[in-house]
């Protein structure tokens, strides 16, 4: 996964925006720097960056996904970044393992520490100490508890919240500073609990939205406009998995515990382990029976 970062430390950072370039009309400039044989997604990102669409960024942090994506970020760093207003803006890559082993966890921690946290601290003076990480995890956990409680309301026969409304709230928890949104999430939870639902449910059927990187709200709106109520989700940037509480003890290294949590709980099918490849399927069946 590649994400764009704006300055600060929320649950490791303040604002996160996924690499997107909607409504791209031309790849002319990007095709000059890349090949016209490379995928349109990568060229769209380069095109948008050169146009100035990412000028609000302080950093780009990504992973080694594919050669085309690596080339895309290299072009952003060399061609677009020098013209961005923030001259401290940096691009960094993390080599994230796709197998849950002791040695892969050590490698994961080393990558996040050296390629991400240390660079943030050196460039912007961001506090990445154990104390700061623990505080970030505490705020993260508060958000996760609230969003999970709201999400569970979708299981009711006559839910007080739509799948679209929940998708909006859940995306907010991924993008916005936790300390800023917590008061509003608490207010929203209280308001939803007090809602009076219609005597008859509005939907014609109940469905689960299953997939990979789904962060387009219009897709959720389209499904529910057709009369289907989205009562569960299982996709990247969704709530299950994704909004689980991170349990920390007082003895082990904080960053190691955080990395271990994500390495073990993620259900990315790109993992090399067979059990990880099968996890999304079994988890989907579990959610359906709920």
Question: What label would you give each PLM region?
Answer:
Residues 1, 7, 63-70, 209-216:
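Gly/Ser/Thr-rich loops at beta-strand to alpha-helix junctions
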Residues 2-13, 285:
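Single conserved hydrophobic/aromatic residue that forms the stacking wall/gate
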Residues 35-50, 271-280:
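Glycine-rich, highly charged phosphate/nucleotide-binding loops
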Residues 109, 116-243:
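A charged, amphipathic alpha-helical module
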Residues 288-290:
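A short, hydrophobic C-terminal helix/tail in secreted or cell-surface proteins
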């Amino acid at each position: 996964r590649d994400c764009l970062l704006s300055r600060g430390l929320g649950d490791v950072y303040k604002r996160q925006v996924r690499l997107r370039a909607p409504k791209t009309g031309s790849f002319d400039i990007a095709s000059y720097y890349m090949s016209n044989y490379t995928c349109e997604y990568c060229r769209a990102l380069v095109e948008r960056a050169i146009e100035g669409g990412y000028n609000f960024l302080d950093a780009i942090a990504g992973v080694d996904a594919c050669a085309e994506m690596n080339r895309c970020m290299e072009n952003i760093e060399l061609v677009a970044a020098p013209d961005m207003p923030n001259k401290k803006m940096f691009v960094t890559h993390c080599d994230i393992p796709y197998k849950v082993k002791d040695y892969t966890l050590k490698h994961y921690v080393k990558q996040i520490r050296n390629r991400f946290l240390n660079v943030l601290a050196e460039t912007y003076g961001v506090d990445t100490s154990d104390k700061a990480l623990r505080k970030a995890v505490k705020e993260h956990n508060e958000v996760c508890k609230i969003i999970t409680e709201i999400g569970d309301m979708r299981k009711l026969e006559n839910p007080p919240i739509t799948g679209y409304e929940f998708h909006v709230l859940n995306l907010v928890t991924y993008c916005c500073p936790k300390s800023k949104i917590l008061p509003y999430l608490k207010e929203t939870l209280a308001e939803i609990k007090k809602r009076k639902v219609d005597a008859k449910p509005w939907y014609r059927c109940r469905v689960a939205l299953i997939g990979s990187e789904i962060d387009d709200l219009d897709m959720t709106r389209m499904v529910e406009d057709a009369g289907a109520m989205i009562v569960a989700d299982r996709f990247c940037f969704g709530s299950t998995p994704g909004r689980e509480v991170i349990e920390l003890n007082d003895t082990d290294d904080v960053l190691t515990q955080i990395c271990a949590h994500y390495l073990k709980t993620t259900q990315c099918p790109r993992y090399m382990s067979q059990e990880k490849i099968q996890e999304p399927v079994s988890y989907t069946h579990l959610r359906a029976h709920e």
